[in-house]
Amino acid sequence: AEIYAVLERETGIGRQEGMQAELAAEGRYCFANPYMLQMTEAVRKYGKRMIVTSDMYLREEDIRRILEKAGYGKFDAYYISNEYRCSKHEGKLYERVREKEGAGRRYVHVGDNLGSDVEQAKKHGFAAVYYENVNTAGMPFRPEDMSAIAWIV
């Protein structure tokens, strides 16, 4: 992936070494969000087709492996921005989904980014459900400035 070429240049860590280290860490530390896991299990019970869309630089096979290891099981299709050379952020990935999955279908997109997952999904005819991510949800509980603590250490 192109990102590892930049990281190699900036850090001196070889592309393959960096990629393998990241994938190992992803495999070790990624786990299923219990609420999203419950939702995917419920959707599967209804027999609905479920696809993954992601603005991510990892390969589809890596994302597939991470999700399966985390307990989500297999999805029906994967649309990963770096493989389609377009993104949810710009809206083009939603167009690819419609082209491949069928323009006449109804889609519900669940995501944690208001711009990419909600606004762009709606612009492209998808129903959209916002799932607040942990960083946004935790923001009110984080101090604005922790620099005073640095003087204690």
Residue ranges and their predicted role:
Residues E2-V52:
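Short, acidic loop-to-helix structural element flanking the phosphoryl-transfer center
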Residues T11, G27-P34, E61, A70, ...:
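A generic "structured core" feature
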Residues M39, Y84-K88, T136-G138:
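A short acidic, often aromatic-flanked loop/helix-cap motif at beta-alpha or helix-coil junctions
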Residues R44-I51, M56-N82:
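Substrate-recognition/cap helix-loop segment adjacent to the acidic, metal-dependent catalytic center
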Residues I80, Y84-S87, G115:
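Catalytic cores of eukaryotic secretory-pathway lumenal/extracellular enzymes that build
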Residues H89-G115:
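Conserved Lys-Pro-Asp/Glu-containing loop-to-beta segment of HAD-superfamily phosphomonoesterases
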Residues V108-V110, G115-P143:
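Acidic, Mg2+-coordinating phosphoryl-transfer loop and its flanking beta/alpha structural elements
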Residues R142-V153:
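Charged, amphipathic alpha-helical linkers/stalks
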